[in-house]
Amino acid sequence: DEIVLVGGSTRIPKIQQLVKEFFNGKEPSRGINPDEAVAYGAAVQAGVLSGDQDTGDLVLLDVCPLTLGIETVGGVMTKLIPRNTVVPTKKSQIFSTASDNQPTVTIKVYEGERPLTKDNHLLGTFDLTGIPPAPRGVPQIEVTFEIDVNGILRVTAEDKGTGNKNKITITNDQNRLTPEEIERMVNDAEKFAEEDKKLKERIDTRNELESYAYCLKNQIGDKEKLGGKLSSEDKETMEKAVEEKIEWLESHQDADIEDFKA
């Protein structure tokens, strides 16, 4: 692969140096005029759009400028379509509820490179309702991201148990970021990478502990599983311990990772 400098500003020595450093010391190719490259690309794209038969063997690929995903427990950005994915594209992933007997899930769609949604850009929100009563984590909610050739994003959420679904469509001119804002978000992700990594690890550890506590709670209450194998005294002791842990988690959202591991 070659690194090609495109655009007049790439003649600036400092920019060339930064590009070289970004690619771990690999020298950019200097055999292409950066101004001519822009003009050539624009001409080819114009030919493709106008249906010129001579451009039949040429393909210009559009890519997703920022990672797309949804918000999950703890404000985590769960990624579905990574940055620089060639479009059109489609990706699905299974999610579930965050509490027992939850009748509605809210799907918040974000773009950005940070691990928490508070640092990314909200594109849209919609609700999936009518979820039958069930323990936390049991319902199967399939979320699908689809980007067409025009860059239009369609997000669908479907309850696999009932077939109930809802969706949102986000166009290119609807609450989207400018190229300058996109560049800033990418730079921020690199700048705060180490800090974000530690924060994400703490939240993941908390979520794992919470999931384990609720799973154990459900098993204790199920006579066909752990609940049927315990004596009344042991069952009462375990139920009390689990409830205390859940209450502690709810009142210590910002505890240190060491506390969650204790």
Curated annotation (Swiss-Prot):
GO terms for biological process: maintenance of protein localization in endoplasmic reticulum; negative regulation of IRE1-mediated unfolded protein response; negative regulation of protein-containing complex assembly; positive regulation of cell migration; post-translational protein targeting to membrane, translocation. Endoplasmic reticulum chaperone that plays a key role in protein folding and quality control in the endoplasmic reticulum lumen. Involved in the correct folding of proteins and degradation of misfolded proteins via its interaction with DNAJC10/ERdj5, probably to facilitate the release of DNAJC10/ERdj5 from its substrate. Acts as a key repressor of the EIF2AK3/PERK and ERN1/IRE1-mediated unfolded protein response (UPR). The modification Phosphothreonine is found at T162. Residues 64-144 are annotated as: Substrate-binding (SBD). The gene is HSPA5. One of its GO terms (cellular component) is endoplasmic reticulum lumen. InterPro entries: ATPase_NBD, Heat_shock_70_CS, HSP70_C_sf, HSP70_peptide-bd_sf, Hsp_70_fam. The modification N6-succinyllysine is found at K91. In unstressed cells, AMPylation at Thr-162 by FICD inactivates the chaperome activity: AMPylated form is locked in a relatively inert state and only weakly stimulated by J domain-containing proteins. In response to endoplasmic reticulum stress, de-AMPylation by the same protein, FICD, restores the chaperone activity. The modification O-AMP-threonine is found at T162. The modification Omega-N-methylarginine is found at R136. The modification N6,N6,N6-trimethyllysine is found at K229. The interdomain linker regulates the chaperone activity by mediating the formation of homooligomers. Homooligomers are formed by engagement of the interdomain linker of one HSPA5/BiP molecule as a typical substrate of an adjacent HSPA5/BiP molecule. HSPA5/BiP oligomerization inactivates participating HSPA5/BiP protomers. HSPA5/BiP oligomers probably act as reservoirs to store HSPA5/BiP molecules when they are not needed by the cell. When the levels of unfolded proteins rise, cells can rapidly break up these oligomers to make active monomers. This is Endoplasmic reticulum chaperone BiP. The keyword Ion transport does not apply. It comes from the Eukaryota. The keyword ATP-binding applies. ATP binds at G8, S9, T10, R11. GO terms for molecular function: ATP binding; ATP hydrolysis activity; ATP-dependent protein folding chaperone. Keywords: ATP-binding, Chaperone, Cytoplasm, Endoplasmic reticulum, Hydrolase, Methylation, Nucleotide-binding, Phosphoprotein. It is found in: Endoplasmic reticulum lumen; Melanosome; Cytoplasm; Cell surface. The lineage of its organism: Eukaryota, Metazoa, Chordata, Craniata, Vertebrata. Residues 53-63 are annotated as: Interdomain linker. Its EC number is 3.6.4.10. The chaperone activity is regulated by ATP-induced allosteric coupling of the nucleotide-binding (NBD) and substrate-binding (SBD) domains. In the ADP-bound and nucleotide-free (apo) states, the two domains have little interaction. In contrast, in the ATP-bound state the two domains are tightly coupled, which results in drastically accelerated kinetics in both binding and release of polypeptide substrates. J domain-containing co-chaperones (DNAJB9/ERdj4 or DNAJC10/ERdj5) stimulate the ATPase activity and are required for efficient substrate recognition by HSPA5/BiP. It is an enzyme of class 3 (hydrolase). It comes from Sus scrofa (Pig).
